[in-house]
Amino acid sequence: MEHIVIIGNGISGVTAARHIRKNSNNKITIVSAESKYFFSRTALMYVYMGHMKFEHTQPYENWFWEKNNIQLKQGFVSNIHPHEKQIEFRNGETLSFDKLIIATGSKPNKFGWPGQDLDGVMGMYHKQDLEKLEKYAPDNKACNNAVIVGGGLIGIELAEMLRSRKIPVTFLVREDSFWNGVLPAQESEMINNHIKEHHIDLRLNTNLKEIKSDENGRVKSVIIEETGEEIFCNVVGLTAGVTPNIDFLKESGIELGRGVKVNRFLETNIKDIYAIGDCAEQHKAIGQRRNIEAVWYTGRMMGETLAQTICGNKTEYKPGHWFNSAKFLDIEYQTYGWVFSEIGKKENETYFQWQHPKEQKCITISF
């Protein structure tokens, strides 16, 4: 019986564990530094908004893991020793494996802004971020203004969370339209208007220069790069994208790029070591996809695929047609196949677009 160790208990790692258990009696250990039990990251916003409790974000009851003979271990992995087939924890403890799956996800980008590590500066990626937000922005008395930096999905979700408690929000987006690296121009403009209708101060073509501190080391204000304007605030949300969480692998001998380099079978350059999810980087992009795809749906598919290989049925990762979905404010967004933004639009690509004259509904077909 082999010992399969999985670092990371997000959707990729947990899916791999579940499917390995369905197809084998191998020993499985999931290691996480964040929380003992798997939870839905996309549901964290609804905890803050009062729609559910944190325990409701856990898809599986606590007894599920023991019943299915999946061991859970909390600890921060500081290094991997591939030739000894051991992982090393920050406290010096080690854990041996026969096969290792790296599913450590991603972490928020930081660009060296002065003040980016002050109290009151946070992302919205982890359970600890939710706890910070409750501490620094419990209501609009403790937090009379928040500034969010970064015009993607996590940024707008954080804005929606804060507005649910009537906290004023200034939203800094460096592009000239919200999410225009993904959305066609008409859809992006529609969402700009929708954001403003929800009383969010949307600042397009705007970059952060500096986060300023009060005398206690807490956020006091931000400075705008283009104008020098100072915006006073109690909370700053840094949501300017993510990068693979792989710093602990730099001395391991595992081939790294922006992420952990893998082939079509999700194998690294070292036998019996694999990578899946946000931290995995394909040597060559599959079709029109990106080399790294930090998307829930692809993470789940990678976990399912790799489980087959681990259990002796070597299977190539073939994600098929692109699909993604999101919900924020009153907008529900879904995409099937390849619909490019104006920035990424192909030379011979044509759009058919329909938009409801009154309601914020639209359809785009690319051909």
Where are these regions (language model features)?
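Rossmann-like NAD(P)H-binding beta-loop-alpha module
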Residues: 132-183, 219
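Beta1-alpha1 glycine-rich phosphate/pyrophosphate-binding loop at the start
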Residues: 2-70, 159-183
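A Rossmann-like FAD-binding core segment of flavoenzymes
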Residues: 26-27, 71-88, 95, 164-262
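Glycine-rich Rossmann-fold phosphate-binding loop(s) that bind the pyrophosphate
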Residues: 8-11, 125, 150-152
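FAD-binding core/adjacent interface of flavoenzyme oxidoreductases
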Residues: 1-5, 62-146, 221-230, 237-239, ...
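FAD-site-proximal beta/loop scaffold in flavoenzymes
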Residues: 117-142, 218-221, 229-305
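FAD-binding beta-loop-beta segment adjacent to the flavin cofactor pocket
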Residues: 108, 263-274, 350-360
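Mid-to-C-terminal Rossmann-like scaffold of FAD/NAD(P)H-dependent oxidoreductases
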Residues: 2, 9, 279-367
